[in-house]
Amino acid sequence: MRVVLLGPPGAGKGTQALKIAKEFDIPHISTGDIFRQNLRDNTELGKLAKEYMDKGLLVPDEVTNRIVEDRLEKEDCKKGFLLDGYPRNIPQAEELDKFLEERGHSLTAVINIQVEREALIDRITGRRVCPVCGATYHIKTSPPKVDNVCDKCGSELIQRSDDKLESVVKRLEVYEKETKPLIDYYTKKGILVNIDGNKSIDEVFEDIKKALLGDRRDDIH
């Protein structure tokens, strides 16, 4: 099973990715994680990526493709994988198709988790984290016992700069601009499945499972 997972910030993509990987016994490949791994291990590809990052430049598709493909060549990906954070544009999507085709494979499905914009903003801006022990809270859905104080260590909670309204709106705009062409691309290929991400975590996961196990309607509500 070879799956790409799409979804805006705040859609619960990370949570669903872990559940999918466990359920179908396939590796969850997050591009952020493999980039960090290559940088940590000081690999040739890591060094190449770092040259661009140190200059404040975007890592070119060619380097990103190689980093992802290097990971997909590993033994644990032989029976499938779940890609999260890649592809991000049409050239990357075309390269992934070519890479898989050369090995006699193709994508099983592209899962697109959809959540209403206001709900996304609410989910993200409500997050609070403990800068000391790393515990996470949400002011509406999982607040601390004492307002703005960590239950575990008593430290004052903070809102990360990424979770502030202005930053969230910008991140969503970037995501929408980046992802719309991809959604069109995979829709034309007949492998995109839209999942209603406004439901509970378990309900969303059940819908994803249905899609991956053969209930391949364009949208699952």
Swiss-Prot record:
One of its GO terms (biological process) is AMP salvage. One of its GO terms (molecular function) is zinc ion binding. The keyword Hydrolase does not apply. Zn(2+) binds at residues 130, 133, 150, 153. ATP binds at residues 10-15, 127, 136-137, 199. Residues 30-59 are annotated as: NMP. It comes from the Bacteria. Coiled coil: none annotated. Monomer. Belongs to the adenylate kinase family. This is Adenylate kinase. It comes from Caldanaerobacter subterraneus subsp. tengcongensis (strain DSM 15242 / JCM 11007 / NBRC 100824 / MB4) (Thermoanaerobacter tengcongensis).
